[in-house]
UniProtKB/Swiss-Prot annotation:
InterPro entries, sorted: AlgH-like
Transmembrane residue ranges: none
A Gene Ontology term for the protein's cellular component: cytosol
Name of the protein: UPF0301 protein Clim_0777
Family membership noted in the UniProt record: Belongs to the UPF0301 (AlgH) family.
Organism the protein comes from: Chlorobium limicola (strain DSM 245 / NBRC 103803 / 6330)
């Protein structure tokens, strides 16, 4: 198998392998936002929470979209990815047309005035992070795969099928993995 870790960079998807059973990351799809010699960080895309953005974040009372669990690190922080880097100061482009962060007050104003559609944004509590060498070790243990991200995938609401579709998109032997049961030992 190709060394998956070498493919990792901002804008790539990090897919939990079928063998990764740890509850924070089981069958997760993460968007990588930073990846360098000091470590890596990203957000879990397929873990919508029970409550909505309007119930949890001041200034975004009109957003009925679910808030997402970005990961187990600093779960008291709010982050967002979006497709409107042209309109939000301080946004960092992760890959073509997908941005991370920026001026939160400006974002709130643009949403409340109808300039930005809430479907163009995903809000996260916390993030997923790894120190130097940690994620590489997890790749060596077979815990992760990589895949290409698309704007459509980032802003979809098809969370339940996101992992299997992402793994299947890699083709070959991954198609079998994508269809494997969550707990193969119970079959």
């Amino acid at each position: 198998m190709v060394n998956e870790f070498d493919k990792l960079r901002p804008g790539k998807l990090l897919l939990a392998s079928a063998n990764l059973l740890e509850s924070n990351f089981k069958r997760t799809v993460l968007l990588m936002c930073e990846h360098n010699e000091q470590g890596s960080m990203g957000f879990i895309l397929n873990r919508p929470m029970e409550f909505k953005v309007c119930e949890a974040i001041a200034g975004f009372e009109d957003i009925e979209e679910p808030l997402h669990m970005g990961g187990p690190v600093q779960v008291d922080t709010v982050h967002f990815i979006h497709s409107r880097g042209d309109s939000i100061d301080g946004a960092i482009e992760i890959f073509d047309g997908v941005f991370w962060g920026g001026d939160k007050d400006q974002l709130s104003y643009l949403i409340n005035t109808g300039v930005i559609n809430p479907n163009e944004i995903r809000f996260f509590l916390g993030y997923s992070g790894w120190g130097a060498g940690q994620l590489e070790q997890e790749f060596e243990e077979g815990s992760w795969y990589t895949a290409d991200a698309t704007r459509e995938m980032i802003f979809t609401d098809a969370y339940e099928r996101m992992w299997s579709r992402s793994v299947r998109s890699k083709g070959g032997e991954y198609r079998i993995v994508a269809n494997s049961p969550e707990l193969p030992g119970l079959n």
